[in-house]
Regions:
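N-terminal pre-catalytic "stem/leader" segment of glycosyltransferase-like enzymes
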Residues: 1-69
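A charged, aromatic-enriched C-terminal amphipathic alpha-helix characteristic of glycosyltransferases
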Residues: 30, 298-302, 312-343
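Conserved donor-binding/catalytic core segment of Leloir-type glycosyltransferases
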Residues: 150-167, 173-176, 188-190
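Nucleotide-activated donor-binding/catalytic signature segment of Leloir-type glycosyltransferases, i.e.
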Residues: 200-225
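Aromatic "clamp/platform" in nucleotide-sugar-dependent glycosyltransferases that forms part
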Residues: 242
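Short hydrophobic beta-strand element within catalytic cores of glycosyltransferases
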Residues: 259-262, 276-277
Length: 425
């Protein structure tokens, strides 16, 4: 089987550098991986990054990236999301009922838009965007396997906030204290976003490190494996979010068979929440946040009721969610979701649009001279230092390096002096 299909993906450099720190980075990494494993009628797809060889390119990030306080563009003027000849797709996420006004012209200038759920698709259509928009439901990794809850000596709630006020850790804590304050048989862990890894601590030790009564807090950044362990060591996920671009956290909980209490509306997999959908209404966010339009506001009394009901009917909750866990995974594993999206794309545009361009000529690398002190490493592994000041980098990151003030373009004479030049020509 040969690589006879091609699909190009592109995003901002900070998304590529972040790897799995937050939603866009995690999604970009997984989409690239699983697009590379797509096969259509014995033709294997090759996922490439920002390549003019591909007739189609998806830019996976906010269409326009602005500082919301000053409304200044955070991308350099020469940054390009697509090549002119390409079929252009925006892959982006929305958490409210309206698209930012400064996104609209950009969204109307591409051929397709992919969003993570029907809620976001409706938001695009209700904002005056006329570009065809499709739902690209994301997926879950193989590591999120079922484990029946209710095996411990107490009931343990979990809330994961990723350092985002819209996930409403404040509402969860208020409800927990009202229902279970000082109850030795029930506890809760808040997994907050952190900036440091502490691998010497187990999940249980991290809980005790920041405990206050029956409330535990984790601030450290955890690996994927550690996050799975965290979910396994807790019984019920609480997630009264005001909106999600897709919603990885509740879906991961559901795939492990974890009873999950969450808001709906934004949620493509709401049917798997059973009777644990928090009642809600649309309204203005109660926190500052990256929103335009209205968001999903959880009803506090409904949250109280569902948390109490989950404890009162704990065994039934554990049985119900564990029984459906394999169905959740089978529908939402990453490869299935990516295969479906690419198959649907081929039906819309034709298989020829995923064939490499026959007259493609590779763009030569950009040669830069490092003028700083010490050393500097780029995201794709190129290292500059006092002994190797001149080297080549990918064209797509050269402009961002030139903006640092530490680099300038190499002259023809300088390029000719380095060994890599001769293999290049």
């Amino acid at each position: 089987m040969t690589s006879e299909l091609i699909f190009s993906l592109h995003t901002d450099q900070h998304i590529k550098d972040a790897v799995n720190i937050f939603g866009y980075a995690y999604g970009y990494n997984r989409i690239t991986k699983h697009f590379n494993e797509f096969v259509y009628r014995n033709l294997k797809l090759r996922a490439v990054q920002n390549s003019p060889e591909a007739p189609i390119q998806m830019f996976y990030m906010e269409p326009e990236w602005y500082n919301q306080s000053t409304m200044t563009n955070l991308r350099s003027p020469d940054f390009k999301k697509f090549y002119d000849h390409q079929y252009k797709i925006y892959g982006t996420h929305l958490e409210a009922t309206k698209v930012w006004p400064h996104w609209i012209d950009s969204m109307n200038a591409v051929d397709e838009i992919w969003v993570g759920n029907q809620f976001a698709k409706d938001s695009v259509l209700n904002s005056g965007v006329t570009t065809p928009t499709f739902v690209f439901e994301h997926g879950i990794d193989d590591m999120w396997k079922p484990k029946r809850r209710g095996q411990g000596d107490k009931i343990r709630f979990l809330h994961v906030d990723s350092d985002s006020p819209r996930k409403r850790a404040d509402l969860v804590e208020k409800a927990f204290l009202e229902l279970f304050k000082n109850n030795p048989n029930v506890e809760i862990t808040f997994k907050h976003h952190g900036s440091e890894r502490t691998p010497v601590f187990s999940i249980d030790q991290l809980n005790r490190r920041y405990s206050d009564g029956n409330i535990n807090r984790i601030y450290e950044t955890l690996s994927q494996d550690e996050m799975v362990e965290l979910f396994y060591s807790h019984d019920i996920l609480i997630y009264p979010s005001e909106g999600e671009g897709f919603g990885f956290i509740p879906l991961q909980a559901l795939a492990t068979g974890m009873p999950t209490i969450s808001t709906g509306r934004w949620c493509s997999y709401e049917n798997y929440l059973g009777g644990n959908v928090i009642e809600s209404k649309l309204g203005k966010t109660e926190h500052t946040g990256y929103h335009y339009g209205e968001v999903v506001l959880a009803d506090y009394d409904s949250l109280l009721h569902l948390m109490k009901n989950a404890v009162d009917n704990f065994e039934k909750q554990c049985d119900y969610f564990y029984a459906q866990a394999n169905d959740v995974y089978n529908k939402y594993n990453w490869q299935n979701r990516c295969d479906q999206m690419l198959t649907d794309l081929i039906k819309r545009v034709g298989i020829k649009m995923l064939k490499p361009l026959p007259d493609f000529k590779p763009i030569p690398p950009a040669y830069l001279v490092y003028e700083g002190n010490g050393s500097y490493s780029t995201s794709d592994g190129v290292r500059f230092d006092k002994d190797k000041r001149i080297s080549s980098v990918k064209e797509e990151i050269s402009s961002s390096l030139l903006m640092t003030g530490l680099f300038r373009k190499a002259t023809v004479e300088e390029i000719k002096k380095i060994d890599t030049y001769y293999s290049y020509i």
